[in-house]
Amino acid sequence: MASEGEGVLKKEGLPEKLRILPLRNMVLYPDLVLPLHVTRAGYRRLADEVYRENGLLAVVAQRNEEAEEASPADIYQVGTVGSIIKLLKQADGTYQIIVGASEKVRLRNISQAGDYLEAEVEAVPEDRSTSPEIEALALNLRMGFQKFVSLASLPLDLANFALNAERPMQLVYAVASHLALSVVERQSILEMPETKAALEHVTFYMTRQLEKLELAQRIQDRVKSVMDKRQRDYYLREQLQAIRKELGEGEDTSEEVHELAARLRDLEMPAEARGAAEKEIERLGRMSPSAPEYHVSRNYLDWLLEMPWSVSTEDRIDVRQAAVILDEDHFDLEKVKRRILEYLAVLQLKKDLKGPILCFVGPPGVGKTSLGQSIARTLGRKFLRISLGGVRDEAEIRGHRRTYVGALPGRIVQGLRRVGSNNPVFMLDEIDKIGMDFRGDPSSALLEVLDPEQNFSFSDHYLGVPFDLSRVMFIATGNLLDTVPAALKDRMEVIEIPGYTAEEKLEIARKFLVERETANHGLTSDHIRIGEDAILEIIRSYTREAGVRSLQRNLASVCRNTAKAIAEGASGPIHIDASGIPEILGPVQFLPETATRSWGCGIATGLAWTPSGGQLIFIETLRTHGNGKLLLTGQLGEVMKESATAALTFVRAHAADLEIEGEEFDRSDIHVHVPAGATPKDGPSAGAPMVVALASLMTGREVRKDVAMTGEITLRGDILPVGGIKEKVLAARRAGVKEIMIPHANMKDLADIPDHLRRDMTIHELQTISDVLQLALLPSPRQGGSSPRS
């Protein structure tokens, strides 16, 4: 658009009707001129007529920019009165015209008149009000437009025209015509009745474009500065290379630096890491190969350039196939399998899902580590495992700072470089055995690794730049979480993997272990056949564990024995049944624990939970002449000692109900012992068997040898819930005990125990100490006996 000075025609009076010239993609403002290219035949005739008549027309923006022929509904209701100042016919038959606008009009009753539209027009008077605020807005717009003209490289006479605008609205239209606005925004400015609102809107639009221009200018200046610096660096580097060449040194260094720079160019990595690498390459280029720091710098660059910054393995997201793979590799473990399949299902819906942080907790040999490998195979990812057992130095996790001699990254970064992928399945084995000393606390360093809100920018001390661990699927394993700090435990999704029953071990042996061990020893089904009765005999008489490692070792012994027999000339297949197991493995190693013990008053069977699974414990008590002392042995922890004290206090308080003479306690010293004295023991779950053993000792009533019990006691006589119910039930079953007593609040935990196990066992629920005494103590030889009410 141009200014009024270029010849806008002013017409005296305004006709009632005007022919309409619709504009596409533009708006013509009052007091401005606009060059137009007219291609449509109807509007060429209109231009001819108006130009010959020296007449007027209504110049209005078209709503639908795509429409070739505008209808009444396609044009806006407000436009300008225009006249054709100049008309030039082109060689292709089209017209080039210049239209000047005089004033703003409103269109009414738009109708079709032959090839073009016409409408009744009504002049819209311009708002010429003034105020200090309007003057300030106009001044601000003038100054901003001057800056805009400078940044946008527009002709300077445009700025002069804006400065010389006589009226605020004239300034508004002049500035708006040179801004990059949409038709809707341009039309809204034209239709604004108030000067103040128009000034504010145009100032807003201009400020928005000024910000873009200033940003573009800053970027251009920055790029120019970088280019100038690179040219200068290149010139100086060439000079340095020439000097070194004259001195006979540095040619190999230059080639090495160029090779590293080429590797960096081809590598996709974060900007911060790239900046660190570029800086180190530049530093390396200034060093002599004989300098002590040269190899340190070179090793650091190798680590930076070989990290899998953007290298990922594609996930194999097939939930059904994943279920098949998990079932092929592991028997049971339904809770873990369900969690992995849920993760895959969500990953199928949300591709940028952060990797879960799982923690498998259970006894040794239940398949925690192998489960991680199976998960990696299911996902199609690489598998990485590090053992944290005995790790005491924080640098093992975070790495050493490069200032130290022999510095290396931590084991997290080392592992990722080794597998060459930024989304492996990363197993942190034995997390419960991590240590701490004067060199730092590795468990605190793991807080950042295992926190989804932080590990996207994990910083290794050696690398010195963040590495994104959010795509890594971390799996921690441990036997017991008691030693794991609460903050670290809170960051992990703990999934408990209990021990296996004899039936489950049999299935695992049949489906996995027998085939694996026979193959490991070069045997086939033509050489050996191991019967189910033989496997059960090994499970019951030669192993006592929650997992299957001892079972696997014993099966390996059977296979070695068979391989020896075949090597000596025996013909296969050799059938192994239960009767042949003692000949191979020797005498039976484990009998039911209750069957191996002498019984009498003062002995009760309890259930304990250890990192290796559940097991039976025996509470033994004896009374000697004394003065009421309580002696505790068997490496008991503080909690277990307190349970013994509470049990004795309860029995003394209810001596009358139990038909015990009160003086008996004052005349006797009581000794409580828990066998396996070399093994430390602690926990509240021995409270119930302790009170039973003490009551049996003082009353002379024997305890049933076919029952085991667990539960914490209170001085008021309540039985409180304890942990590890499934493991304890399995331990009782392994030991041949088919009747157990558990706290009432733990009955809900029986849902984790298979139905076939519960059907074979009798489980009593305990609410008070009265319940356990009534169930566990046999009647007195002298009389029926009684138990206290609590």
From Swiss-Prot:
Specify the inducers: By heat shock.
Q: Which residues bind ATP?
A: G362, P363, P364, G365, V366, G367, K368, T369
Q: Which reaction does it catalyse?
A: Hydrolysis of proteins in presence of ATP
Q: Does the keyword Cytoplasm apply?
A: yes
Principal place where this protein is found? cytoplasm
Disulfide bond residue pairs: none
Molecular functions (GO terms) = ATP binding; ATP hydrolysis activity; ATP-dependent peptidase activity; sequence-specific DNA binding; serine-type endopeptidase activity
Identify the catalytic residues.
S685, K728
**Compartment(s) where it occurs, according to its Swiss-Prot or TrEMBL record:** Cytoplasm
The catalytic activity of this protein is classed by the Enzyme Commission as: 3.4.21.53
Gene Ontology terms, cellular component aspect?
cytoplasm
Q: Which GO terms describe its biological process?
A: cellular response to heat; protein quality control for misfolded or incompletely synthesized proteins
Organism superkingdom: Bacteria
EC class, as a word, reads hydrolase
- Coiled-coil regions, chain positions: none
Q: Which family does it belong to?
A: Belongs to the peptidase S16 family.
**What PANTHER family has UniProt attached to this entry?**
ATP DEPENDENT LON PROTEASE FAMILY MEMBER
Role this protein plays = ATP-dependent serine protease that mediates the selective degradation of mutant and abnormal proteins as well as certain short-lived regulatory proteins. Required for cellular homeostasis and for survival from DNA damage and developmental changes induced by stress. Degrades polypeptides processively to yield small peptide fragments that are 5 to 10 amino acids long. Binds to DNA in a double-stranded, site-specific manner.
UniProt name for this protein: Lon protease 2
Give the organism, scientific name. Syntrophobacter fumaroxidans (strain DSM 10017 / MPOB)
